[in-house]
Amino acid sequence: MTSIRTLLAPLALLASLATSAAASDWKPLAPAHLSLKEPKIDPSAAAEALLWEVKVTDDIDGNGVPITIYEHYLRAKIFTDRGREAFATIDIPFDRSISILDLDARTIRPNGTIVDVKRADIYERTVVKTGDVRVKVKSFAAPALEPGAIIEYKWSEQHHDSISTNLRLAFSRDIPVHEVRYLLKPLDVPGFQMVAFPFHGNFPPPVKQADGFTLLALSNVAAQASEEYSPPALEYRPWVFIGYDRTSRSYTGLEFERSFAKDVYEDYARRSRPNDAIRNLASEAVAGLSSTAAKVAALAAAARTRLKRTETDTAPVVARKAKTPKNAGEALSLGSGTGDDVLTLFLALASASRLEAYPAATISRNVLLPRSVRPHAAFFPERLAAVRNGDQWIIVEPANEYSASGEVPWYFELQRALIANVGQPVGFEIPETPASYSLKKRVGTFQLLDDGTLEGEARIEYLGHWGQTLREQDDEQSPADREKALRDLMTERWPGAELSDIRIENMSDLSKPYVNSYKVRIPGFAQRAGQRLILQPAVFQKGVAQTFAAAQRTTQLHFPFAFSEHDDVTITLPEGYSMQEAAGPKPINAGAGLYTPSISASGSTIKYSRKMSLATPGVYATTLYGPLRTFYESMHKADAHTVIVTRTTAP
């Protein structure tokens, strides 16, 4: 199966030679924009973007690998102090597949004077998002901002190992935008045609430019909502998909699926024929196992552990230059390959074990929901394995670096997988895991001192999707960076806290939970009131902001996965102190959400337990926001419950 990417790889070098460097000059500023006093699109807007332009080109990096470059240019007008505060620190997020380069910024004051951002003032940091997940950003502080000022900045995003064949062009930001402009050069490859799918917007026809680029533009774009636990941004913001496909491809749903599944099946069938070495490995892996599920887990582990990955962010440079295997047998012989080679080896092992296994194609729920999938290969970019188990299917991702037995990450659960079998392709919804699978377990053993200081040890275990998610975000960081990120997170919640003996355990031992542990000293954790101390037993919830604090909701609700939490806290009181008897917080049963706290005291020891679970992954209407907010608000109040610790004997 020859893809357009394969055909275009040699052409990317030519494109790089023909592409000129981005102009270093700033774009001309219309006097009307400098004198603009009121927002144009949203009367309540604190700031609006006057222009957001993105130029998309292809290039080749120093290792000969194709890259796609997005040259961004953003100019925004500040109208109020709230807008000034919103732009005080500007963050540009990126991940392991993206490099941020050539970042420049400046402020134009209302009187026309210009204040540049110094390169030395641009830095990289990590910010914490929902669920303790951390994101890397390039940051800078915008200088001399005030109402009436304009902030403009430009940067390049290099997307590694990429050719601009399947583009997702976003047309909205977190503030209204007067004009959005995308400039791209359509690729000319015989036998392929460009296809476009617009979403959530009324887009005018593309306009060809004199320099060979094509302009896609949209004016007066409303701000996109930025709310916690929202669906993927592509589900509600205006965007356009630009892709390419064979000119002979049919675009009716069923005909597309048959043709696409046939290509996928034939590709993997050719590369996953077992040889003697594969048969021997399969026999060893499933020896003594009887159930299909156990065999699948064992074969997935065998495929993952026998091949050293060559394309991951943690792979050494020499591994990335290793020979590319042509099939499963060659991959096993080399002992190395890509994630796709791991999948191919698994399919060969399954065949050797007389299991009925097929490749399956899907898309991440972190990107797009099934309702927005269109009949194009780019909407089925991910490859999994489907193994028949009676009248059901077991779906695994053998190449999952963060699961010992090939369990699928959360973002494939509830997605529709297209199983490419011999005849008619099968559409199958990947089942969700229960809340008990993804457990966050926190254990704390603390001593309360007479002055209100709390000190002791904490251990947090992350299982299931928690463990996979945090391993994935942390594996590219050094041990020192992991420690710093944990220290920063906890000191933000507990100001003045002193952490020591920080340990990050089981990064590579996937058979065990991912663990963070540390010793901590928190001055002033309990507040003194005369001879009494006011103490919050829910130590791990202190300083945590309420989830769903906003009174209103714009976007639908989207929960990545069902999860549970279990806290066990032991606090030893100062000598001569005891806890006054009082009613503790009550359990909460909200159907899919359960919360069970308990507080008890025995002599000088307080025991606190907290169990919480939420069993509602997927997308839910905004009408459910009220009950959900009530649940989280009640839980937050219960977490903040305090007890009175009184001196019972003289010091």
Describe the residue ranges of each PLM region.
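A sensor for short, sequence-defined functional sites
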Residues: 22-651
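Bacterial N-terminal signal peptides
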Residues: 8-18
